[in-house]
């Protein structure tokens, strides 16, 4: 009985590359959907709420409050919109390339986190480039906190997820090296 010939290694490499590229396109689609959601919410707020107007969203938790921000998070660097716009553009291009090339995104979770940061950077970049400021609308009513938008949620979620994942995997690697060192030879 004859055995089937083994698949040449280059074929499996090509299949893995093809699968990776497919997932990369799915991440780009997810980023595009997140940017679209961000822009739709911002457009709705700009068209339906006066600047400074507040409306309940989730009672006793969060309200829609129309404000604009020429700076970064918590209005930092509000006199340097041009610099923030440039940095956002560079970051957006870098993250697109990072996903495509596989830089520091070794698995699906890290790819998701980078996709979220990409979407947030691109969403706020669109506002800065088009209007010179970013529309913010979500305001916690139960505590004093900065007003934020969908893009900000994406950036913060992606950064926290990626940082947590990196710390967790580093912790696991450190402990596995310790266990290997303690194992009798």
Identify the meaning behind each predicted range:
Residues 2-185:
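Alpha-helical transmembrane bundles and membrane-interface segments of multipass inner-membrane proteins
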């Amino acid at each position: 009985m004859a055995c089937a010939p083994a698949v040449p290694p280059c074929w499996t490499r090509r299949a893995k590359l093809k699968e990776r590229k497919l997932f990369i396109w799915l991440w780009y689609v997810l980023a595009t959907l997140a940017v679209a959601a961000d822009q739709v919410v911002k457009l709705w707020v700009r068209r339906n709420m006066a600047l400074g107007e507040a409306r309940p969203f989730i009672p006793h938790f969060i309200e829609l409050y129309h404000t604009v921000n020429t700076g970064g998070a918590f209005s930092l660097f509000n006199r340097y919109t041009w610099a923030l716009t440039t940095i956002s553009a560079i970051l957006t291009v870098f993250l697109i390339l990072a996903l495509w090339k596989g830089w520091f995104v070794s698995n699906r979770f890290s790819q998701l986190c980078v996709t979220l940061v990409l979407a947030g950077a691109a969403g706020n970049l669109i506002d800065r480039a088009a209007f010179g400021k970013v529309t913010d609308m979500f305001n916690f009513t139960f505590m004093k906190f900065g007003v934020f938008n969908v893009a900000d949620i994406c950036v913060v979620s992606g950064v926290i997820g990626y940082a947590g994942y990196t710390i967790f995997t580093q912790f696991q690697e450190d402990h596995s090296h310790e266990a290997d060192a303690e194992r009798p030879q």
